[in-house]
Amino acid sequence: MRRTVGAVWCAAILAASVGIGAVTTGSGTASAASASRASDGSEERARTRSLLGRWAHYDVVAYQDGLLKTLIVSYGFNDFTRSGGEIIDSAQFCFAEQRTNQPIETSLSDAATQAITPPSTPVETDVVDGRLRVRRPATPTPVGIELRDPATESLPTDPADPRVVDDDGDGKPGITVTIRVTPELTGELYIARREIFAYEAFLEGKNRLVGTVTDGSEQLVIGASDPIFLGSGAHWEQYPDLTKSPILLRRVGRGWDCDRLKAERDRLFPPTPEVDW
């Protein structure tokens, strides 16, 4: 339809008026969105500050190979500190338990567990569905071996490899896993590992972080007390159902140490799980 000049002029004024209104409304919307983002950011910063301090650590990693299903339950601490605007997670391991689906007992000494010393690393934080989420990235950590590049350097296969170290101080290469099949049949495996784990956890209340662990660790057997054990435990893969690999952190005092954690383990954490898949 042809418009007259007057109609066009009126339409232009109307459009300008609507445009001015839209700009004003858009500015209000933008301001509201900006305020919402600022509020979300303030909430995240406040919740992130609440992470600071020492947390007791419990995690389970479910592994399986062709013959054996295994749970490794680890205990320790995570210390969250602030540095340069980032939250840094410093992890420490204290002791561990193992469970299998076979009549075989395997164990790792506290010294071997404490030899696992992941590097401190920044964690990622955000708010998901109103809950603070904390994500620690994988930090490849050698144990029983010294690696210049922990992320890519190959693991040894020879116990005489000069990179192999006695990290648990028992006079054997690598770290020692004790195996008990029967009272008469016991022995040791000497292994080197590259610990590669990451976690995602959500803050529940003020004093609990709950989530799951993702593990891509590598392990090689570099010796045994008896050749019969040499085929044991060379290749493990994490069971894909991550609900079998939970992590739980509980806030504790800064003065807590491994001895106190062991003494109060049952008060803080659920019973040790069994292989059930």
Regions found by a protein language model. Give the residues of each.
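Positively charged n-region of N-terminal signal peptides that target proteins for export
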Residues: 1-4
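Bacterial N-terminal signal peptides
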Residues: 8-21
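Signal peptide processing junction and immediate N-terminal pro/mature segment
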Residues: 18-37
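A long-range scaffold signal marking pre-active-site subdomains of enzyme folds
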Residues: 37-46, 55-64, 139-140, 144-159, ...
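Edge beta-strand at a domain terminus
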Residues: 37-43, 183-277
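Tryptophan-anchored aromatic micro-motifs
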Residues: 40-76, 86-97, 103, 136, ...
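Predominantly extracellular/secreted and cell-surface proteins with exposed
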Residues: 76-204
